Design a protein with these regions (language model features):
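Bacterial N-terminal signal peptides
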Residues: 10-20
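Bacterial N-terminal signal peptides that target proteins for export
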Residues: 1-10
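Secreted/periplasmic proteins
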Residues: 2-3, 18-134
C-alpha cells in the first residue's frame, strides 16, 4: 500500500519529468522565431487519417503541405530537410501536434512524397523556421 508521502513523491517525480521534457524546446522555437533549427526524425501521417481533425481544428488533407510538431505555433512555415545525404527539402505549415522526443515532426503525405520518404517511413531531418505564424 502506498502512503500519502509516497504518492506525493511519485506525483512530484512525474511533474518534474514532464517539465524536463518540455524544457528541451527553446523559447525561440516555441515562439516560431525565424531561423530557429531542430534536428531529429520525421515520419508521415497514415492515409487513414485523411479528413480527421487536427489539433488546430483543420481537417487533415494529405494533398496539402502540412505537419505536426510538439511546440511550434500553428501557422508557422518550416523547412524540413533530409540529413541522410539526399538533401531533399520541403516547406510545410504546422497545423497539428505530435508527441516529440526523437521524432520531431509528422508530415503530410504530399510532403513525405516530396521528401522521398514514403517507402522508408522515417528519416533524419533538420527543421528550420522560415516564417512565423501570421
Amino acid at each position: 500500500m502506498t502512503t500519502g508521502a509516497g504518492r506525493r513523491l511519485m506525483l512530484v517525480a512525474v511533474v518534474l519529468a514532464t517539465a524536463a521534457g518540455c524544457a528541451s524546446y527553446s523559447a525561440e522555437l516555441r515562439a516560431g522565431k525565424r531561423g530557429e533549427r531542430e534536428a531529429g526524425l520525421a515520419t508521415y501521417y497514415s492515409p487513414r487519417l485523411a479528413g480527421h481533425k487536427t489539433a488546430s481544428g483543420e481537417r487533415y488533407d494529405p494533398k496539402q503541405f502540412t505537419a505536426a510538431h510538439p511546440v511550434i505555433p500553428f501557422g508557422t512555415h518550416v523547412q524540413v530537410t533530409r540529413t541522410d545525404g539526399t538533401n531533399r527539402a520541403v516547406i510545410v505549415r504546422v497545423n497539428d501536434r505530435c508527441k516529440g522526443g526523437r521524432k520531431i515532426i509528422d508530415v503530410s503525405e504530399s510532403a513525405a512524397r516530396q521528401l522521398d520518404m514514403l517507402r522508408v517511413g522515417i528519416v533524419p531531418v533538420e527543421l528550420e523556421v522560415m516564417a512565423p505564424p501570421p
